[in-house]
Swiss-Prot record:
GO terms for molecular function: cAMP binding; guanyl-nucleotide exchange factor activity; protein domain specific binding. The lineage of its organism: Eukaryota, Metazoa, Chordata, Craniata, Vertebrata. Guanine nucleotide exchange factor (GEF) for RAP1A and RAP2A small GTPases that is activated by binding cAMP. Through simultaneous binding of PDE3B to RAPGEF3 and PIK3R6 is assembled in a signaling complex in which it activates the PI3K gamma complex and which is involved in angiogenesis. Plays a role in the modulation of the cAMP-induced dynamic control of endothelial barrier function through a pathway that is independent on Rho-mediated signaling. Required for the actin rearrangement at cell-cell junctions, such as stress fibers and junctional actin. Changing residue 342 to A/T: Diminishes GEF activity dependence on cAMP concentration. Widely expressed with highest levels in adult kidney, heart, thyroid and brain, and fetal kidney. Residues 218-242, 398-422 are annotated as: Interaction with PDE3B. This is Rap guanine nucleotide exchange factor 3. Residues 662-889 form the Ras-GEF domain. It is found in: Endomembrane system. The gene is RAPGEF3. It comes from Homo sapiens. Changing residue 315 to W: Abolishes activation of RAP1A. 3',5'-cyclic AMP binds at residues 311-314, 321-322. Its main location: membrane. Changing residue 417 to A: Abolishes interaction with PDE3B. Keywords: Angiogenesis, cAMP, cAMP-binding, Guanine-nucleotide releasing factor, Membrane, Nucleotide-binding, Phosphoprotein.
Length: 923
């Protein structure tokens, strides 16, 4: 590679050959002295990623070369360009806040002329200021999407942090009090009110509202631990839930940490936090920024980033620091736990922990719940408030049965324990083991006590088993049809219950009430099937009578089409079980004429990349990516495969057809289709998907995979249509429609498709179309900027999470982030801890999976005029969503054709092809 500005001498840059005589001995860490400042090579050397293990050869024309020893692939930020760029970003952010503060000041003067005036307090006069409480009242009176005092306090804290608001005594924390006075710096602005100014004010308040929660969290962390309020402790605790350094800790420990964490900022890169050999006094978590880890002899070992931690080992082992920590960039923020607090928390955890042993081995570990950590109800008299941390599967089940009472409600902690167990039991207790254990408990009778006591014990125990089984059936529903062990167990249990009149009558009385009080959704998102009580209970619904809304759900026993291509692009379609293995697919192919043995099954994407499939791989038809196809070929032909023409995507766009349908109606059609896919996902599919098929072989995640494929399809659909629109004017109109489409999807609470469309608009092939973006009206560009805020990934997508928390169901969440959270929980926590099941991990996975149940707890109202609404209306009209297909948004394209179009989108997913088309549009 040759490097140089036009007119400069060219430098040839490449890996050095160690045995080359032209190089001589490499000079480790040396830089060539002959490289002038300002040349392109000088800039390359500043920004170039240089691994320690390689030397680089720099050949200047007619001059002797030199060698450079690299440090690591991560670029260091001590170059002037990087510092200038970072400072410019911070300066731009500050300018936006200052401008927002001036706009807010101007509007407050116009609406509340007496807000800012001279104040007298404790014999002191404060000129031209307002009290904290009055300022909060004034901003609340503006409306503009601000609904709570805490939200306004966050806005004011942002203004205070950036200097757009000042405390008369220079306090750094905003307080909503009458005796705290604040003033806006600078001259008093002219009170001008225009329609455009009101729009800018709304945009300013939205910006401040977005940054408000982060400012409040920083204030809470800056406070001394003893001065933090309960609300601030909850805020810190919520933040700790998304920090990977503490993901392995229990929630009770995280609450303890929230009370002792200290905020420690450092402003300058190169600051040494501590040195190797120092005494360990603190444990650090990186909240913002990054650090370099350096040791004697090895130099730079690694770089740690946001969410990583360091320093814990020295506290645990009471040993000196094993490395030196150096700030890698400016403005690094750390969360610090001092040694005495660290040791106290460890001791408190041990004091709250109870271990049960059998035959000299620990079989159950319980932790006493902290006061206020549980639901807001008084503890039940005589019942200890312990949480299962780990245990053997049998002991966890035994404790669950003992904890279940006949009078527990849906808000009882036992109900959550039951839900956690049922959602995750396949991870640690397969159905065969669970059924055997339940039958064992059903037959167990106590050895001592009177006959009446024994009879009461047996009756209560069997009631608990029936209740657990009924909830198990309610959760999994028809998924148990394909499990022979489960069906056999349910039949045996039905026979046993039929012999006991008390249990049969109790089952008939309790089941309808249980169904009304506690609805555990099945795979279709509707009410769970109830048992039909005749002479014997029928546990499972009749397969001949499918449940409402289940037509699109793929079950384990279903057969799906396997479209298999030959190298000549001829296609054979087989109907095979969705969980069929590659070996079974090849066996079915062997029975077809013209197919020979010795061939392999591979999947090929639109770029022509082929990946061989292992014989034991299952569900390959439903796990195919976007525009991927299955090919059966001889092994030597794999590298010669050419994608099927259908994989390459369209060559002509649909801009003319899309012009006939409004963005509102298009969003409604997309949302209706997404709901049909989203409702087909069972909660447990998230857990199965994260664990992988190698752990659970007799389950399918086809519904979840189909929904994820739809997400990818939508984002590439946006990029495809824009790249296939050759005329600048219509292309700008199409871009405008997609931005409005994203806004309507957000309004309809379809956040998954909203993110997909926004990701499509941010595709590099689209974002580079500068002339197209310039054609957009200013109002549309402002709308796009406002929508982009929800995509902010900082602090683990805090903006999105806060927005989601404010939405009431029905909601379609951003599924990739939910799966990321599930993967984070799975990979950050061991399933086994000291040979016991880590039930704390199961609890966290179940909590994440229940997000689907929460989002679908109210039925959506169809938004498309094509689909019937009568059968979908919810009983509670207050939660029904209003149709967006108003008279003002009627489209000239028929709803039927639009519905067919959104279900069969054709896209180009080859990024190289999209980039090529983009360059043709705007070179």
């Amino acid at each position: 590679m040759k490097v140089g500005w036009p007119g400069e001498s060219c430098w040839q840059v490449g890996l050095a050959v160690e045995d080359s005589p032209a190089l001589g001995a490499p000079r480790v860490g040396a830089l060539p002295d002959v490289v002038p400042e300002g040349t392109l090579l000088n800039m390359v050397l500043r920004r170039m990623h240089r691994p320690r293990s390689c030397s680089y050869q720099l050949l200047l024309e007619h001059q002797r070369p030199s060698c450079i020893q690299g440090l690591r692939w991560t670029p260091l930020t001590n170059s002037e360009e990087s510092l200038d760029f970072s400072e410019s970003l911070e300066q731009a952010s500050t300018e936006r806040v200052l401008r927002a503060g001036r706009q807010l000041h101007r509007h407050l003067l116009a609406t509340c002329p007496n807000l800012i005036r001279d104040r007298k307090y404790h014999l002191r006069l404060y000129r031209q200021c307002c009290s904290g409480r009055e300022l909060v009242d004034g901003i609340l009176a503006l409306g503009l999407g601000v609904h709570s005092r805490s939200q306004v306090v966050g806005i004011c804290q942002v203004l205070l942090d950036e200097g757009a608001l000042c405390h008369v005594k220079h306090d750094w924390a905003f307080q909503d009090r009458d005796a705290q006075f604040y003033r806006f710096p600078g001259p008093e602005p002219e009170p001008v009110r225009t329609h455009e100014m009101e729009e800018e004010l709304a945009e300013a308040v939205a910006l401040l509202s977005q940054r408000g929660p982060d400012a409040l969290l920083t204030v809470a962390l800056r406070k001394p631990p003893g001065q933090r309020t309960d609300e601030e402790l909850d805020l810190i605790f919520e933040e700790l839930l998304h920090i990977k350094a503490v993901a392995h800790l229990s929630n009770s420990v995280k609450r303890e940490l929230a009370a002792v964490l200290l905020f420690e900022p450092h402003s300058k890169a190169g600051t040494v936090l501590f040195s190797q050999g120092d005494k360990g006094t603190s444990w650090y978590i990186i909240w913002k920024g990054s650090v370099n880890v350096v040791t004697h002899g090895k130099g730079l070992v690694t770089t740690l980033h946001e969410g990583d931690d360091f320093g814990q080992l020295a506290l645990v082992n009471d040993a000196p620091r094993a490395a030196t920590i150096i700030l890698r960039e400016d403005n690094c923020h750390f969360l610090r736990v001092d040694k005495q607090d660290f040791n106290r928390i460890i001791k408190d955890v041990e004091a709250k922990t109870m271990r049960l042993e059998e035959h000299g081995k620990v079989v159950l570990v319980l932790e006493r719940a902290s006061q206020g950590a549980g639901p807001s109800r008084p503890p039940t008299p005589g019942r200890n408030r312990y949480t299962v941390m780990s245990g053997t599967p049998e002991k966890i089940l035994e404790l669950l049965l003992e904890a279940m009472g006949p009078d527990s409600s849906a808000h009882d902690p036992t109900e959550t324990f039951l839900s956690d167990f049922l959602l995750t039991h396949r991870v640690f207790m397969p159905s065969a083991q669970l059924c055997a254990a339940l039958l064992h408990h059903f037959h167990v009778e106590p050895a001592g006590g009177s006959e009446q006591e024994r009879s009461t014990y047996v009756c209560n125990k069997r009631q608990q088993i029936l209740r657990l089984v009924s909830q198990w059936v309610a959760l999994y529903g028809s998924m148990l049809h394909t499990d022979p062990v489960a069906t056999s167990f349910l039949q045996k249990l039905s026979d046993l219950v039929g012999r006991d009149t008390r249990l049969s009558n109790l089952l008939r009385e309790q089941w309808p009430e249980r169904r009304r009080c506690h609805r555990l959704e099945n795979g279709c998102g509707n009410a769970s099937p109830q048992m039909k009580a005749r002479n014997l209970p029928v546990w499972l619904p009749n397969q001949d009578e499918p449940l409402p809304g289940s037509s699109c759900a793929i079950q384990v026993g279903d057969k799906v089409p396997y479209d298999i291509c030959r190298p000549d692009h001829s296609v054979l379609t087989l109907q095979l079980p969705v969980t069929a293995s590659v070996r079974e697919v090849m066996a079915a192919l062997a029975q077809e004429d013209g197919w020979t043995k010795g061939q392999v099954l591979v999947k090929v994407n639109s770029a022509g990349d082929a990946i061989g499939l292992q014989p034991d791989a299952r569900g390959v038809a439903t796990s195919l990516g976007l525009n991927e196809r299955l090919f059966v070929v001889n092994p030597q032909e794999v590298h010669e495969l050419i994608p099927h023409p259908d994989q390459l995507g369209p060559t002509v766009g649909s801009a003319e057809g899309l012009d006939l349908v409004s963005a509102k109606d298009l969003a409604g059609q997309l949302t209706d289709h997404d709901w049909s896919l989203f409702n087909s996902i069972h909660q447990v599919e998230l857990i199965h998907y994260v664990l992988g098929p190698q752990h659970l072989r007799d389950v399918t995640t086809a519904n979840l995979e189909r929904f994820m494929r739809r997400f990818n399809e939508l984002q590439y659909w946006v990029a495809t249509e824009l790249c296939l629109c050759p005329v600048p004017g219509p292309r700008a109109q199409l871009l405008r429609k997609f931005i409005k489409l994203a806004a309507h999807l957000k309004e309809q609470k379809n956040l998954n498709s909203f993110f997909a469309v926004m990701f499509g608009l941010s595709n590099s092939a689209i974002s580079r179309l500068a002339h197209t973006w310039e054609r957009l009206p200013h109002k549309v560009r402002k709308l796009y900027s406002a929508l982009e805020r929800l995509l902010d990934p900082s602090w683990n997508h805090r903006v999105y999470r806060l927005a989601l928390a404010k939405l009431s169901p029905p909601v379609i969440p951003f599924m990739p982030l939910l799966l990321k959270d599930m993967t984070f929980i799975h990979e950050g926590n061991h399933t086994l801890v000291e040979n016991l099941i880590n039930f704390e991990k199961m609890r966290m996975m179940a909590r994440a999976a229940r997000m689907l149940h929460h989002c679908r707890s109210h039925n959506p109202v169809p938004l498309s005029p094509l689909r019937s609404r009568v059968s979908h209306l919810h009983e509670d009209s207050q939660v029904a969503r209003i149709s967006t297909c108003s008279e003002q948004s009627l489209s000239t394209r028929s709803p039927a054709s639009t519905w067919a179009y959104v279900q069969q989108l054709k896209v180009i997913d080859n990024q190289r092809e999209l980039s090529r088309l983009s360059r043709e549009l705007e070179p």
